[in-house]
From Swiss-Prot:
Gene: PrBP
Subcellular location: Nucleus; Cytoplasm
Cellular component terms (Gene Ontology): cytoplasm; nucleus
Keywords: cGMP, Cytoplasm, Nucleus
InterPro entries: Ig_E-set (IPR014756), PDED_dom (IPR008015), PDED_dom_sf (IPR037036), Rhodop-sen_GMP-Pdiesterase_dsu (IPR017287)
GO biological process, one term: sensory perception of light stimulus
Protein name in UniProt: Probable cGMP 3',5'-cyclic phosphodiesterase subunit delta
Organism field: Culex quinquefasciatus
Length: 151
C-alpha cells in the first residue's frame, strides 16, 4: 500500500463507524438479533450471541447501518467465515458510491450452505469467527473479527 493509500485509508477510517447491525429471517422479516455497537473497530475481537435457530434458516437478511464523513467511490466488504481459523465460506458484497457526511443502511441477503455441509451448533459455538474487511475500492478501511456464540 502506497503512502497515498495509507493516508486515504486513515482519513476514511477516522470518519467511519458502524452504528448498528440487525440479522433477520429473510423469509419472514422477523428480527433474530440486533446490536448497537461499532463492529468496525479493528483492535478488538468482538463477540456476538445469536439465536441457535439462525442455523436452521434458508437465508438471513443483514442490515448494516453506518456513518461516514468521507465520500467513498466503491464501498464494499469481504467476509470470511472461519472455523477454528480455517476458511469455511467467503462472501463479497459491493455497495458502490457513498456520499460524504451521511448515515446509510445497507441490506444484504446471505443464503445458508446446503444442509449436508452444516455442522451442529455445539461444534460451531465459540469456534466460528467472521472476519470482515471494509474497503473503498482496493483501499482497506478497516478489518474486524466477530466470534459467534449460539444461544
Amino acid at each position: 500500500m502506497g503512502t497515498d493509500d495509507v493516508a486515504k485509508s486513515e482519513k476514511i477510517r477516522e470518519g467511519f463507524q458502524i452504528n448498528w447491525l440487525i440479522l433477520r429471517d429473510a423469509d419472514t422479516g422477523k428480527i433474530l438479533w440486533q446490536e448497537n455497537k461499532d463492529f468496525s473497530c479493528p483492535d478488538v475481537e468482538h463477540e456476538a450471541r445469536v439465536p441457535i435457530k439462525i442455523l436452521d434458516l434458508r437465508a438471513v437478511s443483514r442490515e448494516i447501518n453506518f456513518s461516514t464523513v468521507e465520500a467513498m467511490e466503491n464501498f464494499r466488504l469481504d467476509q470470511k467465515v472461519l472455523f477454528k481459523g480455517r476458511i469455511m465460506e467467503e462472501w463479497f458484497f459491493e455497495m458502490g458510491w457513498v456520499s460524504p457526511n451521511t448515515t446509510n443502511t445497507w441490506q444484504s441477503t446471505i443464503e445458508a450452505a446446503p444442509e449436508s455441509q452444516m455442522m451442529p451448533a455445539k461444534v460451531l459455538n465459540g469456534n466460528v469467527t467472521i472476519e470482515t474487511s471494509f474497503f473503498d475500492g482496493e483501499t482497506l478501511i478497516s478489518k474486524s473479527v466477530v466470534r459467534l456464540y449460539y444461544i
